[in-house]
Amino acid sequence: MATEVVIYTVVHQPRRIKLPAQPIPAGATIDDIVRCVFDERMNERYFRKVANTCYYPATDTFLRLVRGGMKLSIGFSVSFLRQAEEWDPALLGRFKELVAHPNVELVGVEPYHNFVFFLDMPLFVERMRWMREELYRVFGKRPRITDTTEMCM
């Protein structure tokens, strides 16, 4: 019979695409392409809604539980981290507090939670290395283990 349980969760917030799509002009910069492709107003709206109904309550619960001895493994998509940095630094601060707890293990996940490993394995490896450094930049901690999107590897 198991005497210990570890909970693993991934925090991911996708970005919404503009509909209808906007044409991308010739010679567009990366910033121009982002403005044409993604609906940032909708992204912010959904982010704030999910933060209030899910991320804050879940983080409060996880903090209470790990302080009581529960062990938690948690991973973050870069998509989520970028949105949290821009729209809710206080929420990111709560996650930093959680990740800093000794009962919490930081897990590396594919940065944008996609299936790039099916298309380009060297790019996947490069992005996973980059993700490791991004997590260190945000949390001051590098993951020792990784997960792939939906554990498909």
Please give the residue ranges for each predicted region.
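Catalytic alpha-helical scaffold of carbohydrate-active enzymes acting on polysaccharides/glycoconjugates
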Residues: 1-144, 151-153
